[in-house]
Amino acid sequence: MVAFLFCNLLLVACGSVTWTMSDTGESGVDLADRLDLVEKIGDTHSKDLEIWMELGKQREADAREMHAVCRVQPSAMLPPDQPQITGLVLFRQLGPSSRLEASFNLEGFPAEQNTSNHAIHVHEFGDLSQGCESTGPHYNPLGVPHPQHPGDFGNFVVRDGRLWKHRMGLATSLAGPHSILGRAVVVHAGEDDLGKGGNQASVQNGNAGRRLACCVVGTSNSEAWESQTKERKKRRRESECKTT
């Protein structure tokens, strides 16, 4: 597009020079030719303006920071004796071509286990009419085996019933044809075997077990992310103070 714009500007310059030279010559060009040249120059300027405006829109889109929030709640179909997990999953993407980052802040896991691993994935549908069971399979727009699905976030370590984690460089996106907006994030009861379980379920969902809690990803402003970032920095400072 930039090359096309340069060519147009060059043509306008050449046309202007030709006209100027013809004005100084003996014969020159007739009035009709001059009017035709003026019209062509005007059309070229209009096209150039449109191109510049489109380039400006593209730059604005590339620079637009996107945010999303997912408010996790226990599955409506979950038996009462199961963990009641709640919390927030926040997303930030600096631009459509940037890698996604996410902040996970969940609680309600069994505290008596002290530490455990739980899988978290993006599922295809944002349908919670039957709790987390109606969110469908893993979101897999490219038809690849698990754990290469764009929303395969992997395993998260839970300590004392709490999960607090920040991850960067995630393969999924808030923009484009494979956006996860409107889709579900699901917290599982078990650990993801990362496709190494040796059965069909392993390459579909990692044998991650029951769906404990879920939410639907929706657009948001930056306030929740900024608040979470401040809290994360505060926790890091407190942790550093304890170790010194």
From Swiss-Prot:
Its main location: secreted. SUPFAM superfamilies: Cu,Zn superoxide dismutase-like. Keywords: Antioxidant, Copper, Disulfide bond, Glycoprotein, Golgi apparatus, Metal-binding, Oxidoreductase, Secreted, Signal, Zinc. Protect the extracellular space from toxic effect of reactive oxygen intermediates by converting superoxide radicals into hydrogen peroxide and oxygen. It catalyses: 2 superoxide + 2 H(+) = H2O2 + O2. The lineage of its organism: Eukaryota, Metazoa, Chordata, Craniata, Vertebrata. The keyword Secreted applies. It is found in: Secreted, Extracellular space; Golgi apparatus, trans-Golgi network. This is Extracellular superoxide dismutase [Cu-Zn]. It comes from Rattus norvegicus (Rat).
